[in-house]
């Protein structure tokens, strides 16, 4: 069974991560309180797809030794291959999303953590919210 292990946000690109038990998400809005919701994300571009939610596999973090907080991703998953969700619809709890593109590691992550090459092809997924709702730690993830 694929699940959400953790939900994290950052108010600013280099600020500390804050863990949430649950989070409201809506199309084009990102997670309330996250840097992409307030337009201050490193790669923020108004109206650009793939900025609502970022996901990363717990298994990839464990293999590289990178913490969920340092990854900068919003949702840590377990038991699902996120690369397989590019271009596909999936559900977390009652929220429907579409995998937009891979969330490859960037220079900001490399400079902050020293991790780069190890996450190429394993850096996670950028997703668009299609149906608003709430996601929570422990929610099941299901491909539609």
Residue ranges and their predicted role:
Residues 1-96, 101-102, 132-134, 144:
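Electropositive, beta-rich accessory/interaction domains or terminal extensions
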Residues 35-38, 108-112:
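Membrane-targeting and insertion segments and their boundary/processing signals
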Residues 64-74, 109-124:
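Short, basic/aromatic beta-hairpin or loop at an interaction surface
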Residues 97-98, 117-134, 140-144:
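Acidic/glycine-rich phosphate/pyrophosphate-binding loops and surrounding catalytic core
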Residues 103-107:
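Well-ordered mid-protein domain cores that form the structural environment of catalytic cofactors
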């Amino acid at each position: 069974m694929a699940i959400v292990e953790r939900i994290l946000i950052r108010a600013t690109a280099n600020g500390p991560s804050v863990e949430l038990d649950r989070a409201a998400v809506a199309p084009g809005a990102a997670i309330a309180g996250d840097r992409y919701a307030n337009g201050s994300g490193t790669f923020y571009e108004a109206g650009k797809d793939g900025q609502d939610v970022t996901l990363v596999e717990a298994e990839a973090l464990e293999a590289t030794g990178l913490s969920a907080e340092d990854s900068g991703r919003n949702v840590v998953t377990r038991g699902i291959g996120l690369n397989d969700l590019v271009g596909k619809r999936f559900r977390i709890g009652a929220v429907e999303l579409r995998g937009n593109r891979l969330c490859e590691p960037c220079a900001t992550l490399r400079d902050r953590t020293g991790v780069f090459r190890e996450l190429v092809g394993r850096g996670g997924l950028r997703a668009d919210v299609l149906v608003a709702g709430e996601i929570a730690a422990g929610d099941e993830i299901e491909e539609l």
